[in-house]
């Protein structure tokens, strides 16, 4: 019992170093002010080209097959020939059973293979299954792993259970980047988003990510603001730079520019790099291309 209390106290002590008592209304007001004052200046071709290079080009459909994922990857292979003046996406994101297909099809340098894992999207399975799935994805070629926190554990106060799962999966990933999805729409409050951000970083996350895209609401500017504040404070206390990835519900170019603006204003120019900033999306690539080229493009 004493050991459990000390473990619980360890996580409470980590949270106590940060302000986790946030007002949702205050966050909404700050975000609205930031969008009004700062977003217009970032609506430039240069920013849009940069945002394209931050995309984790994603296909996470129940209808995905070896053939469809192969075609999806071939589009990335063809991109440089079709758009020689633009840089390619950051990564291709697929279910773990398709890692080998992407690895065997992908021919371009600099595009990573990201796989969702750990019982995505609900995270409701045995830790042994999560470990095995993650290890198999990496063995098949995944460079990056995207997992979901055990939301039920967090909401019931089992911080230890939530954090130990992340730590165990990071041990499996080793040098491969681990992106930890908070599923912010299920957390209901800015305070919970702040707490899960801190606990995830404390447990070994290389990135924190808003959403799976399988639950509504998905990414929101308010969630992004809280997460970026947490990343900034964590960096100030530890010297460790953690990446940020909004995902799900990024339906317009302006949505992407809003997330860019939040990162720029809260974290600074250092984070404006696709090693620390990603966008998880299936539709944004064509929208950005269309905006940059001034005509409708449906390349992907």
Locate each region found by the language model.
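Short, hydrophobic beta-strand segments that form beta-sheet elements in well-ordered domains
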Residues: 92-94
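N-terminal start-of-chain detector that recognizes signal peptides
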Residues: 22-26, 30-33, 86, 217-218, ...
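Metal-centered catalytic cores of metalloenzymes
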Residues: 286
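Charged, compositionally biased N-terminal leader segments and the immediate start
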Residues: 1-53
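Alpha/beta enzyme core
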Residues: 39-52, 58, 63-87, 97-244, ...
């Amino acid at each position: 019992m004493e050991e459990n209390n000390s473990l619980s106290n360890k996580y409470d002590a980590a949270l106590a170093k940060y302000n986790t008592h946030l007002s949702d209304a205050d966050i909404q007001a700050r975000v609205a002010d930031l969008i009004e004052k700062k977003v217009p200046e970032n609506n430039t071709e240069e920013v849009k080209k940069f945002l394209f290079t931050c995309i984790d080009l994603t296909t996470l459909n129940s209808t995905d097959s070896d053939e469809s994922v192969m075609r999806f990857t071939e589009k990335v292979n063809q991109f440089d020939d079709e758009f020689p003046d633009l840089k390619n996406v950051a990564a291709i994101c697929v279910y773990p059973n398709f890692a080998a297909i992407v690895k065997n099809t992908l021919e371009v340098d600099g595009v990573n293979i990201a796989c969702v894992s750990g019982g995505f999207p609900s995270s409701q399975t045995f830790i042994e299954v999560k470990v095995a799935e993650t290890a198999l994805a990496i063995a098949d070629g995944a460079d990056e792993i995207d997992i979901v926190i055990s939301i039920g554990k967090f909401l019931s106060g089992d911080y230890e259970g939530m954090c130990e799962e992340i730590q165990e999966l990071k041990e499996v990933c080793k040098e491969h980047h681990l992106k930890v999805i908070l599923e912010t729409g299920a957390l209901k409050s800015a305070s919970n988003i702040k707490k899960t951000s801190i606990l995830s970083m404390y447990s070994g996350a290389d990135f924190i990510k808003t959403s799976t895209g399988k639950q509504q609401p998905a990414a929101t500017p308010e969630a992004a603001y809280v997460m970026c504040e947490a990343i900034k404070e964590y960096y100030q206390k530890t010297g460790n730079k953690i990446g940020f990835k909004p995902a799900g519900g990024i339906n317009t170019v302006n949505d992407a520019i809003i997330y860019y603006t939040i990162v720029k204003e809260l974290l600074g120019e250092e984070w404006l790099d696709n090693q620390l900033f990603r966008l998880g999306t299936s539709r944004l690539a064509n929208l950005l291309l269309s905006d940059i080229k001034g005509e409708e493009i449906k390349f992907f």
